[in-house]
């Protein structure tokens, strides 16, 4: 078990070489973010199974955009509001919210999984519900570019069309 603040591109291979899988945990803000990116890059380049939850999934998207798609300045608007590549962005309905108390997307939400995906394999069904607690989402304006580069959007909310799962 490694705290992401202790990981970087220089030590990730040595520290993670014996891992059978990597979990990138949820969180908020900048703390440990570069270590999460280092772990994700190592996992992707070495075919180590990886699960990113909430901010962890967002970091997967950012790392992929930077290192596979060549969008070196890709980021979340939570970390860098002026990033030229807003691959993770504040939900549209959140952009004018000034009172943050109780403003997050909370509770269980429907998600439809694509058959043949690893997520479908794990759940054994197409319709699932998962709980949420966040305000930032995968920016669907980039969906086609991500899928063309090999990151597939395999879980989607049927009402909002928000991407919930990527592989």
Give the residues covered by each predicted segment:
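A short, well-structured beta->alpha microelement
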Residues: 1-13
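Short, flexible loop/turn elements at secondary-structure junctions
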Residues: 3-5, 28, 115, 142
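Flexible loop/turn segments at secondary-structure boundaries
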Residues: 6-9, 30-32, 58-61, 137-139, ...
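Cysteine-nucleophile active-site neighborhood
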Residues: 15, 21-110, 116-118
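C-terminal and late-domain segments of enzyme folds
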Residues: 15, 106-167
């Amino acid at each position: 078990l490694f705290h992401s603040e202790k990981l970087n591109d220089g030590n990730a291979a040595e520290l993670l070489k014996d891992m059978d899988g990597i979990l990138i945990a949820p969180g908020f803000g900048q703390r440990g973010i570069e270590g999460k990116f280092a772990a994700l890059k190592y996992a992707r380049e070495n075919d180590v199974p990886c699960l990113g939850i909430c901010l962890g999934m967002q970091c997967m998207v950012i790392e992929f955009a930077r290192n596979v798609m060549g969008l070196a300045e890709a980021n979340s608007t939570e970390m860098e509001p002026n990033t030229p590549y807003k691959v993770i962005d504040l939900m549209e309905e959140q952009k004018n919210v000034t009172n943050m108390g109780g403003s997050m997307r909370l509770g269980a939400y429907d998600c439809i999984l694509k058959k043949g995906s690893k997520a479908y394999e794990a759940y054994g069904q197409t319709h699932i519900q998962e709980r949420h607690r966040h305000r930032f989402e995968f920016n669907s304006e980039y969906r086609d570019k991500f899928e063309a580069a090999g990151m597939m959007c395999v879980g989607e909310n049927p009402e909002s069309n928000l991407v919930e799962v990527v592989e």
